[in-house]
């Protein structure tokens, strides 16, 4: 009671195909697929960009830390 059965879904699908036609539905599906693919590419490129920034920041921090550790040693040598 209140649920949609498989037969009701099939009837709705048949009506949609009759109203819009298969070519229109195919192009609509292609457009939707392209939009989803573009969204996924944008999300993955954003994640890649963030990961690249994180690794660059870590390298910079490590280089800075190594440079500050070497400075006291060179001061001792001069004294």
Swiss-Prot record:
One Pfam family recorded for the sequence: TatA_B_E
Sequence ranges of Low complexity compositional bias: 58-67
GO biological process, any: protein transport by the Tat complex
MF term (GO), any: protein transmembrane transporter activity
Stretches for region Disordered: 43-79
Keywords: Cell inner membrane, Cell membrane, Membrane, Protein transport, Translocation, Transmembrane, Transmembrane helix, Transport
Subcellular location: Cell inner membrane
Transmembrane feature ranges: 1-21
Source taxon at top rank: Bacteria
GO cellular component, one term: TAT protein transport complex
Membrane topology category: Single-pass membrane protein
Segments of skewed composition (Basic and acidic residues): 46-57, 68-79
Broad class of the protein's primary localization: membrane
Gene3D superfamilies hit by this protein: 1.20.5.3310
Subunit record text: The Tat system comprises two distinct complexes: a TatABC complex, containing multiple copies of TatA, TatB and TatC subunits, and a separate TatA complex, containing only TatA subunits. Substrates initially bind to the TatABC complex, which probably triggers association of the separate TatA complex to form the active translocon.
HAMAP family for this protein: TatA_E (MF_00236)
Family label: Belongs to the TatA/E family.
Function: Part of the twin-arginine translocation (Tat) system that transports large folded proteins containing a characteristic twin-arginine motif in their signal peptide across membranes. TatA could form the protein-conducting channel of the Tat system.
Protein name: Sec-independent protein translocase protein TatA
Species annotation: Shewanella sp. (strain W3-18-1)
């Amino acid at each position: 009671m209140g649920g949609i059965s498989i037969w009701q879904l099939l009837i709705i699908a048949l009506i949609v195909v009759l109203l819009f036609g298969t070519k229109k539905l195919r192009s609509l599906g292609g457009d939707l697929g392209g939009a989803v693919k573009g969204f996924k590419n944008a999300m993955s490129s954003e994640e890649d960009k963030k990961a690249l920034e994180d690794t660059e920041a870590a390298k910079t921090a490590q280089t800075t830390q190594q440079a500050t550790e070497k400075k006291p040693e060179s001061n001792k040598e001069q004294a």
